[in-house]
Amino acid sequence: MEKHITTPITQEITKDLKSGDYVYITGEMYVARDAAHKRMIEALDRKEELPIDIKDSTIYYMGPSPARDGRPIGSAGPTTATRMDKYAPRLLDLGEKAMIGKGKRSKEVIDAVIRNKAVYFAAVGGAGALLSKCIKSSEVICYDDLGAEAIRKIYVEDFPVIVVIDSEGNNLYETSIKEF
């Protein structure tokens, strides 16, 4: 099924998303990879506040290439989600509602998705130039010393993703194997 949603992505939205749904997202989301995730968890361990508003947030696992003239961002394809698996459950428990990446997730992440009624989306790997056309603005908001791995806030219009793991734990990577 095809659905259009806007951020922030709340539990009201995630409960209606099913594994295998094609979804187009419009709104603000964060961009962060493993180095930024590690810093956020280290900040939490020191009892510091996160540098982003995690409640009902969407984090896209991506490291952009430099922007061309007149564009907000360069190629913007997803990175492998498993690199964030050791950090994601804690952020989900704090209110993150959606993750976008590519590839499988650990049992701990899937359990946290179910527990928090969140969702894991996949974006098409190898299509970073096309995906970047959906990104209308991009701003580094923290950890700028990390370069391409700094946390960004982006605004997207009709950003295409597929629900891989829905809020009930249904996993497209498992069900599609059985189907085909």
Residue ranges and their predicted role:
Residues 31-32, 36-159:
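Feature captures the catalytic cores and cofactor-binding loops of soluble hydro-lyases/lyases
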Residues 88, 164-180:
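Active-site/ligand-binding-proximal alpha/beta "capping" segment
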